[in-house]
Amino acid sequence: MAELFYDADADLSIIQGRKVAVIGYGSQGHAHALSLRDSGVDVRVGLHEGSKSKAKAEEQGLRVVPVAEAAAEADVIMILVPDPIQAEVYEKDIKDNLKDGDALFFGHGLNIRYGFVKPPAGVDVCMVAPKGPGHLVRRQYEEGRGVPCLVAVEQDATGNAFALALSYAKGIGGTRAGVIRTTFTEETETDLFGEQAVLAGGVTALVKAGFETLTEAGYQPEIAYFECLHELKLIVDLMYEGGLEKMRWSISETAEWGDYVTGPRIITDVTKAEMRKVLAEIQDGTFAKNWMDEYHGGLKKYNEYKKQDSEHLLETTGKELRKLMSWVDEEA
């Protein structure tokens, strides 16, 4: 079972005694920087020259400096720029500013897991990964609550890396909800698998296949959209609140019976075997290498896939139907 840690297990004074640089000011960056500041931590934000986020960070009362300067000043450096550019930012602005005893933090383990970033032996390497988007992390913190976090230590140069990581998690509200101890390898591999096989890749492929099956059989695209995409939110919300049990308790007996007898015909042993192949490609680094090659090669295939899906009948139908739904903008 998972090892859980709460407020009483973490010493906030540890992170309060350090100088923290948050590199990046996107979804997670703003939540980390503002919440750490409000927890009494000495924070600066490191941004590249010309960053559009600079004005926003300064308006919110944070000190913004170039990335290299932030790294030189701080002894805890949290890298929260997008995965594909982390290695470049590290090599250019962070690597030469690290000192023995410093700590390098990440919000996701990809660049450490696959060796794109190789920290020196004298620094702690930790991860604090909230299991929610940045706006939720910040809102929960402000309301006196928190979002559960994953915490990991890849390199414990000082002997105090885990205590430091727990302290950091407490500074952003994570220990109020609960912190789960993991490893960089476990977090990275499960995160990528979940995204590809279930949450993004799996769901979008399932929705498109269902929509295409109905429209190819002569049903109206609008009706197919409602049945295969729109109502997905109702089911996912129920699962989010109470797992499969609450979802099945809430739907009709007809729908529940269809779940039991038809679901296994759609997600078959063949599908699961393909999932195992996907996991193997994540574990052996194939996916990470291919993704980095694609990104640094100009994103040609990525943009082709994106364009194809934007022109799919599912998408064009949805754009028109959502104009009928006044509540959609209100929920966004």
UniProtKB/Swiss-Prot annotation:
Pfam families: KARI_C (PF01450), KARI_N (PF07991)
Keyword Thylakoid appears in the UniProt entry: no
Cited HAMAP family: IlvC
Keyword terms of this UniProt record: Amino-acid biosynthesis, Branched-chain amino acid biosynthesis, Magnesium, Metal-binding, NADP, Oxidoreductase
Domain KARI N-terminal Rossmann: 2-182
UniProt binding sites for Mg(2+) 1: D191, E195
UniProt-annotated binding residues for substrate: S252
Protein name (record): Ketol-acid reductoisomerase (NADP(+)) 2
Family membership noted in the UniProt record: Belongs to the ketol-acid reductoisomerase family.
Taxonomy, superkingdom: Bacteria
Source species: Streptomyces coelicolor (strain ATCC BAA-471 / A3(2) / M145)
Active-site residues (renumbered): H108
Domain (KARI C-terminal knotted): residue spans on this chain: 183-328
Cofactor comment text: Binds 2 magnesium ions per subunit.
Binding site for NADP(+): Y25, G26, S27, Q28, S51, S53, D83, P84, I85, Q86, G134
Cofactor dependency: Mg(2+)
An MF annotation (GO) of this entry: ketol-acid reductoisomerase activity
Biological function: Involved in the biosynthesis of branched-chain amino acids (BCAA). Catalyzes an alkyl-migration followed by a ketol-acid reduction of (S)-2-acetolactate (S2AL) to yield (R)-2,3-dihydroxy-isovalerate. In the isomerase reaction, S2AL is rearranged via a Mg-dependent methyl migration to produce 3-hydroxy-3-methyl-2-ketobutyrate (HMKB). In the reductase reaction, this 2-ketoacid undergoes a metal-dependent reduction by NADPH to yield (R)-2,3-dihydroxy-isovalerate.
Cited InterPro entries: 6-PGluconate_DH-like_C_sf (IPR008927), KARI (IPR013023), KARI_C (IPR000506), KARI_N (IPR013116), KARI_prok (IPR014359), NAD(P)-bd_dom_sf (IPR036291)
